[in-house]
Design a protein with these regions (language model features):
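Terminal processing/anchoring signals of secreted or surface-associated proteins
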Residues: 1, 23-25, 56, 137, ...
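Bacterial Sec-dependent N-terminal signal peptides
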Residues: 1-32
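Long, intrinsically disordered, low-complexity segments
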Residues: 3, 23-24, 82, 100, ...
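Membrane-proximal, proline-rich intrinsically disordered regions
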Residues: 23-84
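Proline-centered turn/helix-capping motifs that create local helix->coil transitions or kinks
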Residues: 25-28, 181-189
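Conserved, well-structured interaction surfaces
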Residues: 46, 50, 58-64, 98-184
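Short, glycine/acidic-rich hinge or "gate" loops at secondary-structure transitions
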Residues: 68-74, 150-155, 187-190
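Hydrophobic, small-residue-rich alpha-helical packing segments that form membrane-like cores
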Residues: 193-195
Length: 198
């Protein structure tokens, strides 16, 4: 009987503790890091629209913000291996007899032997790079809707330029989707209209 009443008291205490505590909106915080710039703050500068578009193009050619080692777009793989066009070329050419890489960087020989799996670091790097590129394009398109531009007071020539930038971002996204479909078959289709998260 004592054991039974002890369990009831313990259960009652736990239920009370869980129901009386709350986060008090602790998760609804703005980052305090001075290096983090939120979209609302970034796009207050009219030049930022063109700069972000330039980053979308640069995503095809560079692997991060700083060069060979530092601030990569994608972590978990050497920045030299995570560059979009390099990975795309490897997947398209090294898997044929058109190109041969005679050294054994990581799982690169698997390309020659036609023995690759999703755990291959190069396959994963290209998949992640394509997802990153599509996500970046979607973020730009999400931040340049008519409603957001109107709310920021964007008018005139800048508004016209941004409409052109949006078309370019859509093209870059379509290019990445075409690569994804060619290389991976079925691929998740996400646009700027889809909510962030799951």
């Amino acid at each position: 009987m004592k054991k039974y009443s002890f369990k009831i008291i313990l259960l009652g205490t736990l239920v009370t503790l869980f129901t009386l505590t709350s986060c008090l909106k602790d998760l609804d915080q703005v980052p305090q890091d001075k290096d983090i710039v939120l979209a609302d703050e970034l796009f207050n500068d009219p030049a930022a629209y063109k700069q972000v578009l330039a980053k979308l193009y640069a995503g095809l050619a560079i692997s991060g913000q700083q060069g060979p080692a530092g601030m990569p777009d994608i972590t978990g793989i050497d920045e030299g291996f995570s560059q979009y066009l390099r990975q795309y070329w490897l997947a398209q050419e090294v898997t044929t007899d058109e190109a041969v890489i005679g050294w054994a960087d990581g799982s690169l020989p698997d390309y020659h032997e036609h023995d690759w799996t999703p755990s291959n670091e190069f396959i994963a790097a290209l998949y992640n790079r394509i997802i990153y590129q599509i996500t970046s394009c979607n973020a730009f398109l999400r931040e340049t809707t008519e409603a957001k531009l109107s709310g920021r007071g964007v008018t005139g020539q800048l508004l016209s330029d941004i409409q052109d930038y949006r078309n370019e971002a859509r093209f870059l996204r379509a290019l990445s989707y075409s690569h994804a479909l060619d290389l991976y078959g079925k691929f998740p289709f996400v646009t700027e209209a889809d909510e962030v998260g799951f």
